């Protein structure tokens, strides 16, 4: 769309990425929209679960995380809301009266989304529901709490999710809208290699506990000569003890904007998707794939199938089928600098050519233009 638009985003949080990977992509996407000349405002609950836990759990690290966000994204206009207040509907009407496009992320309280949608007919904005989670597949009843019949369309972060909205929820207009890397923040850095293998990821409510055992913990036990580091949150005591037993260094919460430095200090990174993304939702890469490749680090993945041909498996990254193969690949890559270099270059090339937040911002504008016809 050639005209300059007023765009509103409602998300669980943009400020906090604590156990909240959605913030990664949304930050970069909103900045690219601003750079296209649009006016963007981001709304989030003042007491969001992610921000509350960030402040409660992380101490000084929380201050560092928020400060780094503010420095990295000065363009973003953040408005904190209190959706339980009686005057919230009036607040919404005043805020959205000149808005052209409203993006409603899936990890919002349904009552927030529904109150926004109740104003759509009166105010005339385009409303798009953005889903970058597996709930539509695993807990469909939770999605039905949203008044989806009022949206102009759904942005689904994978074709499998898009089909669920079309076939399962009866949404006529749905687009596959993958996440992508914010290449201004995620790019190769020059650092001395101090880590052999890094895994950046949260525990995931037992959605990949067996996979972490097979593809992270067991290889680390088999290769004690490697220095293996884990970043993430919500690891239960049993999991932490397993890391200790495998001589894996657990470092806890890592503000996402610090990830490029950790990748630069590491020889190889792992991608171990949650079970849903290697089974029923095969083909959907999570944000860590885009970010790791954008940082130019060789990536080795536990099983997942790139059904949408986003990448070049075997060239952009490696996929192993079991823990034994993971162990073999880690041993091989540790010794073969040429193989590491080629993997890193290939993955970085694919990201830059196809999977940046600028690519997705352009796609979003094309979708909005299609709706407006």
Name each model-derived stretch.
Residues 11-13, 19, 27-31, 41-165, ...:
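Extended catalytic core of nucleotide-activated donor transferases of GT-like folds
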Residues 22-33, 214-215, 364:
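Short amphipathic alpha-helix
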Residues 25-28, 44-45, 241-246, 251-252, ...:
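Catalytic binding pocket for nucleotide-activated donors in carbohydrate/polymer assembly enzymes
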Residues 28-38, 218-223:
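A short, Lys/Arg-enriched amphipathic alpha-helix followed by its capping loop at the start of a domain
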Residues 41, 229, 300:
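Conserved beta-strand positions in the Rossmann-like core of class I SAM-dependent methyltransferases
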Residues 108-109, 160-162, 235, 299, ...:
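Alpha-helix capping/helix-boundary segments
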Residues 160, 177-180:
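Carbohydrate-associated surface elements
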Residues 182-265:
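Conserved catalytic-core segment of nucleotide-activated headgroup transferases in glycan assembly
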